[in-house]
């Protein structure tokens, strides 16, 4: 896991994981809020 020969793989993986989590959590919250509003309106 600690390979100095591939310093490019570590930052890319970190950025990708961070982006997925940063986008996934608010997306789930947004979708849940929309569904809740639709159910309340109905």
From Swiss-Prot:
InterPro entries: PSII_cyt_b559_bsu, PSII_cyt_b559_CS, PSII_cyt_b559_N. This is Cytochrome b559 subunit beta. PROSITE patterns: CYTOCHROME_B559 (PS00537). The keyword Transport applies. Its cofactor is heme b. With its partner (PsbE) binds heme. PSII binds additional chlorophylls, carotenoids and specific lipids. GO terms for molecular function: electron transfer activity; heme binding; iron ion binding. The lineage of its organism: Eukaryota, Glaucocystophyceae, Cyanophoraceae, Cyanophora. Pfam families: Cytochrom_B559. The chain crosses the membrane at residues 17-33. It comes from Cyanophora paradoxa. Its main location: plastid. NCBIfam families: cyt_b559_beta.
């Amino acid at each position: 896991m600690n390979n100095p020969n591939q310093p490019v793989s570590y930052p890319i993986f970190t950025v990708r994981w961070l982006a997925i989590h940063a986008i996934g959590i608010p997306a789930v919250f947004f979708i849940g809020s929309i569904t809740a509003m639709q159910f309340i309106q109905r």
